[in-house]
Curated annotation (Swiss-Prot):
GO terms for biological process: glycolytic process. Coiled coil: none annotated. Keywords: Cytoplasm, Glycolysis, Lyase, Magnesium, Metal-binding, Secreted. Mg(2+) binds at residues 242, 289, 316. The keyword Repeat does not apply. Its EC number is 4.2.1.11. This is Enolase. Belongs to the enolase family. It holds the Pfam family Enolase_N. It catalyses: (2R)-2-phosphoglycerate = phosphoenolpyruvate + H2O. InterPro entries: Enolase, Enolase-like_C_sf, Enolase-like_N, Enolase_C, Enolase_CS, Enolase_N. It comes from Flavobacterium johnsoniae (strain ATCC 17061 / DSM 2064 / JCM 8514 / BCRC 14874 / CCUG 350202 / NBRC 14942 / NCIMB 11054 / UW101).
Length: 430
């Protein structure tokens, strides 16, 4: 047993220049575990609460209150606890907070400690984090969803959908998948440049061009980039969308004018489901995330019945990595996949519970970053530890995104012949 002797938090800056929290957990043997917490731009209403300071400093986005909660309340409780008792550590913090959404201490404070403790425990044993958390069965490298065109709340592009992603499903390994995705990313840059469009990137490293033709223009442009890179669109490369529909759901309608101006349409729930089905029929779209508003259960049901047998329907804002929300979705037969964001729920233990529930119900799991990231690469290890089979962590640019991809390259090398890359098998459409 190795005892925690120190828990210390500090305020650092994320990839958008906003404050976030970083936590150190130190054991009696002098072993350190360190974790930095990400932050989202488009957040679900049902997510655990990220504690911000308000006031003038950092435009109200400081996290010194969360830092103080770690350094006083949480530290006092955890010092003297075994670093290997992850469930106990997480439950102690949940009990200390005492709210259903972690609004007292802050999910950012609690998560930082939870992940730092797991890292310290892994380091104590001389194990990589993926092996400590996942045990001997942790060997699946995820297929990367590479976000190459940003829209919605992640850019200034006049497109409602937040992410247009490529899936290198015919890659033979994670290393090969990264090569394919990166080549297409550079090909897309040239395609956009030749059209006189901006090649500036959004929060997650994808391009944010002013595509006058909206969604279909983005998809057609990606198709051209894929082909110019020497790959087959619809075979070697498939498409995934993150609609982030909650971001443009207004007064019971899906209001595309919020991002697309006067060219955008306003759709009912039924029309939204029909529109997504039409896109999936026209383009090789294998996955759609948050195609409906997070509380539009009827809309989600209609969408699932319409295309859920052939398209992965991922719940992000819908499920917020929460077993209660996920359980409801499973009972209602809604969606068939869960997006996994550790900061939506706030502890490693609860994250693992959500992934296990999804697997037991036949739902797929997609490990995910947030738009506000740091150099912390914990989610790369967790994707392998939990055998998610898929990961969303941005484009082939920005060091905060590449940190995760590079860690996965290292893990694949370390696993050697035992590494498994699922390709199309990552998608178990019911």
């Amino acid at each position: 047993m190795s005892i925690i002797i120190k828990v210390h938090a500090r305020q650092i800056l994320d990839s958008r220049g906003n404050p976030t929290i970083e936590v150190d957990v130190v054991t009696e043997n002098g072993v350190l575990g360190r974790a930095a917490v990400p932050s989202g731009a488009s957040t679900g209403e049902h997510e655990a609460v990220e504690l911000r300071d308000g006031g003038k400093a950092y435009l109200g986005k400081g996290v010194l209150n969360a830092v103080n909660n770690v350094n006083t309340v949480i530290a006092e409780e955890l010092v003297g606890t075994s670093v290997f008792e992850q469930n106990t550590i997480d439950q102690l913090m949940i009990d200390l907070d005492g709210t259903p959404n972690k609004s007292k201490l802050g999910a950012n404070a609690i998560l930082g400690v939870s992940l730092a403790a797991a890292k310290a425990a892994a380091n104590e044993l001389g194990l990589p984090l993926y092996r400590y958390v996942g045990g001997v069965s942790a060997n699946t490298l995820p297929v990367p969803m590479m976000n190459i065109i940003n829209g919605g709340s992640h850019s200034d592009a006049p497109i409602a959908f937040q992410e247009f992603m490529i899936f290198p499903v015919k890659a033979t390994s994670f290393t090969h998948a990264m090569q394919m995705g990166t080549e297409i990313f550079h090909s897309l840059k040239k395609v956009l440049h030749d059209r006189g469009l901006s090649t500036a990137v959004g929060d997650e490293g994808g391009f944010a061009p002013n595509l006058a033709g909206g969604t279909e223009d983005a998809l057609d442009t990606i198709k051209l980039a894929v082909e110019k890179a020497g790959y087959t669109f619809g075979d070697e490369i498939m498409i995934a969308l993150d609609c982030a529909a909650s971001e443009f759901y207004v007064d019971g309608k899906y209001d595309y004018t919020k991002f697309e101006g006067e060219t955008g349409k306003i759709r009912t729930s039924a029309e939204q489901a029909d529109y997504l089905a039409e896109l999936a029929a026209k383009y090789p779209i294998i996955s759609i995330e948050d195609g409906m508003y997070e509380d539009d259960w009827d809309g989600w049901k209609a969408l699932t019945e319409k295309i859920g047998n052939k398209v992965q329907l991922v719940g992000d804002d819908l499920f917020v990595t929460n077993v209660a929300r996920l359980s409801t979705g499973i009972e209602k037969g809604i969606a068939n996949s869960i997006l996994v964001k550790v900061n939506q729920i706030g502890t490693l233990t609860e994250t693992i519970a959500a992934v296990n529930m999804a697997k037991n119900a036949g739902y797929t799991s997609v490990m995910s970053h947030r738009s506000g990231e740091t150099e912390d690469n914990t989610i790369a290890d967790l994707a392998v530890a939990l055998n998610c089979g898929q990961i969303k962590t941005g484009s082939a640019s920005r060091s905060d995104r590449m940190a995760k991809y590079n860690q996965l390259l290292r893990i694949e090398e370390e696993l050697g012949s035992t590494a498994y890359f699922p390709g199309l098998n990552a998608f178990k459409i019911k």
